[in-house]
Amino acid sequence: MRLSNVTLLALASFVYAKNVITIHPVDGPLDDPKPLHKRNEPVQNGFYPGVFMVQDDSSGPHVDHVDLSNPGIKMPSGEQPKSGPTYLTTGLVQDPQISIFAGYLRDDTELIKRLNDGDSYTVVLAPSNAAVASLALKPWQFPNAITGKSEKDKDALANENISSFVANHVVVDTQLVTTFDVVKRARTLSGLEIEIFTENNKILVKSNDSTSTVTKIIQTNNGAIWVMDESLVKPELA
């Protein structure tokens, strides 16, 4: 049976695989993406916004690994599709378990430009749908309280809250690879301080509010999406 070009392209775009991997953190100065300059925090107090590259290695912690940057499909002779990069904007729609966070992120038009830029490298620390649903308040309801506000103010504050929630879960940096032999500290776009380390053969990301386990890594040509079982920020309840 001879497959059509459309069918073959679809196959090449949606290949999934499970690998055992090692996370190699990347330290270095913060990128200066002009659309995001208002959100970037300067490097200070020894903290660097870390980026963590993924490499196949049987000695590493166990997580699901989906490599969209290199589908690895061998096509029949004469049926080769046009090759091209797969960016984070595509990776975000590949996994339904992060659809809520992906929806929040897609509302940030300036950040989306970066995620669709092949010259920038970004790590998205995406809370799963279950993690978002478990929060005592919805992401658009904190940190700025919207109760008792006018409809206009509610909309403005909700948008600010969503932008803050997203910025707390995005890390940008240059690709300077180091070895993963100590706890690595980093800052998100919002300036949130996080630590990344391994424990009991798992990759963990710790903030002041939570310690989250990385359950899957989706690798693309311009970054990676880490699917996490907890949000890095949680609402403060009276």
UniProtKB/Swiss-Prot annotation:
Residues 85-232 form the FAS1 domain. Keywords: Signal, Vacuole. It is found in: Vacuole. It comes from Yarrowia lipolytica (strain CLIB 122 / E 150) (Yeast). It holds the Pfam family Fasciclin. This is FAS1 domain-containing protein YALI0D26906g. Residues 1-17 form the signal peptide. InterPro entries: FAS1_dom_sf (IPR036378), FAS1_domain (IPR000782), Mug57-like (IPR040200). GO terms for cellular component: vacuole.
